């Protein structure tokens, strides 16, 4: 036998010692007991079977017979008024589903004609809805509404509709040739003049285009002049009542400038700086209006939700914190002054609210609602909350407000019926209107005609199906103008007095209906 090495001898001794240790611990018997406790892998659990129950057939229970005489129910002959009342509330096609007892051929023929006409009208509406999908406006159904005499009983409305039916697109030049700005139109203004008509429009690059509508008849091309008074998008263009030879324009670059139409020279009136930042930090101007009771007082709102007023007769000085009023914590898209009480203004904001303010009562206590510290606000009369942002608001001379926003509704408010402006404003009419403009179309904004010559209060708003919709102050549609419109005339407005309408598109072209 070969001699084992020292290492091998120690290894075998360790193995023997471990065996003796395991034996002393009695692990073999313990492992056997564990095995007995564990279920066998091959053994499967048997499912309990329950006896199948037979389905019990339900027997029809016939209703018990009851006497109408004992129950006190009168027959048709005994109570014809109640029968007729119930009959008038029946479903539209109930007589067709439930066979009519009428056997006279003339009655049957008349019923058949009425039903066929109803079905025809309903099918028209159904097909129109299917074609438009979920994004549609009430104006898309104008041809159906106009043909239905049941929808209105108003001679003034009918005559106004007849007048707007005569409106045609401007025919002197091809609408596709009337390009008034280089890029997408963001603001438009119809000058008050009725003889030498002028349309001005601003675009996203700060250009202002001026179109002399009634220039010489021999002109083969439209007479258009384009200037660039601003560095950013133009938010508003207006003509003061007292100075009709001037155009005021506001821009996101923080400035308000005045353009002399005779000299075509532009000068700066206001440059809004943020008082909480350095002087170079501009407050983008979102809207401007002149006060009706003081033609020199210019009201302005900003993209940050603040308000400022300035007398244009005095030189403008850099703003201080006390000069700014906080109206919203987010962008103010539009505001309007009450023509009857110029201390009242209405604002529409990205924060999904419309608010009415009293500019006479200004204090820090009025600004407790704001998330910003040390703010000053006017007194808040009341507000209207929307599901999504409110794009614009406009106030007419008969105390009606109109607003629209991304919730796809036009809301009309009547403040004549209220002795005091309520805390929570409620629209008396809501009109379905598609306002989903997307990235390449300017925001839709409804605008009243300032001083209608025919006495009919009306507003205009662009339709996403390349049209202009016109409504009266009750919310009844007057016109749906589509003639030769090649793009969505998103930015639109009335002539202040005449029933002429103009709209501007994303390509810088304008469509004039006269």
Swiss-Prot record:
The Swiss-Prot or TrEMBL record annotates one GO molecular function as: DNA binding
State the gene name recorded for this protein. Answer: PRW1
Sequence ranges of the WD repeats: 180-221, 229-269, 280-320, 327-367, 385-423, 438-481, 483-514
* GO terms of biological process kind: DNA damage response; regulation of DNA damage checkpoint
Q: Where is this region: Disordered?
A: 26-116
- Please give the SMART domains that the UniProt record associates with this protein: WD40 (SM00320)
Member of which family? Answer: Belongs to the WD repeat DDB2/WDR76 family.
What range does the record give for the signal peptide?
A: none
Q: What Gene3D superfamilies would the database entry show? A: YVTN repeat-like/Quinoprotein amine dehydrogenase
Give the matching InterPro entries.
WD40/YVTN_repeat-like_dom_sf, WD40_repeat_CS, WD40_repeat_dom_sf, WD40_rpt, WD_repeat_DNA-damage-binding
Phylogenetic lineage: Eukaryota, Fungi, Dikarya, Ascomycota, Saccharomycotina
Q: In what ranges is there compositional bias, type Basic residues?
A: 45-55
Protein name in UniProt: DNA damage-binding protein CMR1
GO cellular component entries:
chromatin; cytoplasm; nuclear periphery
What single Pfam family name could you report for this chain, choosing any that match?
Answer: WD40
Which segments show compositional bias classed as Basic and acidic residues? 34-44, 56-65, 92-116
């Amino acid at each position: 036998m070969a001699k084992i090495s020292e290492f091998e001898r120690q290894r075998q001794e360790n193995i023997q010692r471990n065996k003796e240790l395991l034996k002393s611990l009695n692990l073999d018997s313990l492992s056997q007991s564990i095995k007995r406790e564990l279920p066998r892998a091959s053994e499967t659990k048997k499912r309990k079977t329950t006896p199948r129950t037979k389905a019990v057939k339900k027997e029809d229970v016939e209703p018990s017979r009851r006497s109408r005489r004992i129950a006190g129910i009168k027959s048709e002959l005994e109570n014809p008024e109640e029968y007729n009342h119930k009959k008038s509330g029946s479903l539209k096609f109930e007589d067709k589903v439930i066979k009519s007892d009428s056997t006279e051929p003339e009655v049957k023929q008349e019923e058949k004609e009425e039903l066929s006409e109803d079905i025809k009208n309903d099918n028209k509406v159904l097909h129109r809805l299917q074609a438009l999908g979920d994004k549609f406006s009430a104006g898309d159904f104008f041809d159906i509404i106009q043909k239905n005499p049941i929808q209105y009983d108003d001679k003034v409305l009918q005559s106004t509709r007849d007048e707007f039916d005569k409106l045609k697109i401007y025919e002197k030049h091809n609408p596709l040739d009337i390009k008034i700005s280089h890029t997408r139109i963001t603001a438009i203004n119809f000058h008050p003049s009725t003889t030498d008509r002028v349309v001005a429009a601003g675009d996203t690059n700060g250009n202002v285009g001026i179109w002399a509508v009634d220039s010489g008849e021999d002109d083969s091309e439209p007479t258009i002049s384009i200037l660039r008074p601003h560095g950013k998008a133009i938010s508003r263009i207006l003509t003061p009542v007292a100075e009709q030879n001037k155009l005021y324009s506001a821009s996101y670059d923080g400035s308000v400038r005045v353009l002399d139409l005779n000299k075509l020279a532009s000068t700066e009136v206001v440059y809004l700086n943020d008082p909480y930042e350095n002087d170079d930090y501009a407050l983008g101007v979102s809207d401007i209006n002149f006060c009706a009771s003081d033609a020199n007082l210019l009201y302005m709102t900003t993209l940050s939700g603040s308000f400022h007023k300035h007398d244009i007769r005095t030189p403008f000085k850099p703003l201080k914190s006390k000069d700014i009023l906080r109206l919203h914590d987010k962008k103010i898209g539009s505001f309007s002054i009450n023509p009857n009480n110029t201390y009242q203004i209405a604002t529409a904001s990205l924060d999904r609210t419309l608010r009415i303010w009293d500019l006479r009562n200004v204090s820090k206590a009025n600004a407790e609602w704001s998330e910003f510290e040390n703010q000053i606000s006017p007194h808040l009369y009341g507000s209207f909350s929307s599901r999504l942002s409110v794009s614009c608001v406009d106030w007419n001379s008969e105390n009606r407000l109109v607003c629209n926003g991304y919730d796809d509704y036009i809301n009309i408010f009547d403040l004549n019926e209220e002795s005091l402006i309520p805390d929570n404003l409620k629209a008396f009419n809501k009109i379905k209107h598609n306002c989903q403009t997307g990235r390449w179309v300017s925001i839709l904004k409804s605008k009243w005609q300032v001083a209608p010559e025919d006495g009919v209060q009306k507003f205009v708003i662009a339709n996403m199906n390349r049209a202009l919709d016109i409504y009266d102050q009750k919310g009844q549609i007057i016109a749906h103008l589509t003639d030769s419109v090649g793009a969505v005339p998103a930015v639109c407005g009335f002539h202040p007095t005449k029933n002429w309408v103009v709209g501007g598109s994303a390509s810088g072209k304008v469509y004039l209906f006269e």
